[in-house]
Amino acid sequence: MIRPEIYCSIAGGGPAITYLAGGAAAVDARARVLGWAGASAGAIVATCKAFGVSDEVIREIITSVLASGKALDFGVANIPRGGLFSLDVVGDLLDLHIGKGAKMGDARTALVVGVTDLDHGCPLMLSKARHPGVLVREACLASSSFMCGVVPASSIPSLGTDLSPDVRLFGDGGLSHNTVDDVWDHKPEPRVSLALAPSDAGVRLRPGDIPGILAAIPRALLWAAGQRRSMRHGLDVDIDGANDWAFVKSPARCATEWAQGYDSAAKHSPWFLGVANPTHSLIG
């Protein structure tokens, strides 16, 4: 069966990236993805996919970090990390599995990594086409810096050199454009955008519910920016999964969330392929 050609975007999700990574695997199994885009934790998965890292290795990367507690390592300037990985861990994993010194221009497919230009208060889309000389490690460090404060441009020289010298600080890509779902709008091929499903509207936040409040912030930003919308030739896939902002997870939980994300995305496969068995999961 001929797989259709599409482009795929992966939203940020913090430690819930387990679900979205599973969803990305389901899409990749059913279509020929011509380009990957991502912001925040989604940028890490998108970059790995664009460089041909296998789904098994991506799953192992996420599982090893969350199961080991490395997500709570201290980051830049001893600021405790609250995101998926500490910045050093992200860089080391990308160097190991993609290659030390790899640049955006080396990706096998089109690639877009969303970061936030804090000096100008706007999103900045780093791409293989426009920023081939930017180091993959540094692009992902800037994009996945959620709750680590900011990333000084001086610490990611390939960004500072390739872009404007008046950019001093970068922030997490999810702060300004968490879904990066419109970067492929100019392409004639369909676009599939993966994001966590909205939470139950009946669940009320309570004072002191830190995980719930953290999960509500990006949803509010998405609403304000009007980024969740219907596209002329695309599909917004809401991945079923709960983000409780748990930064330490057992391998069994990571596997379960991966499988749930895979099956959630696979249910949409008839839209672009007509798969007879859309509930097949990567995890047995």
Residue positions per predicted region:
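Patatin-like phospholipase
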Residues: 1-37, 47-284
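Gly/Ala-rich beta-loop-alpha elbow adjacent to hydrolase catalytic centers
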Residues: 38, 42
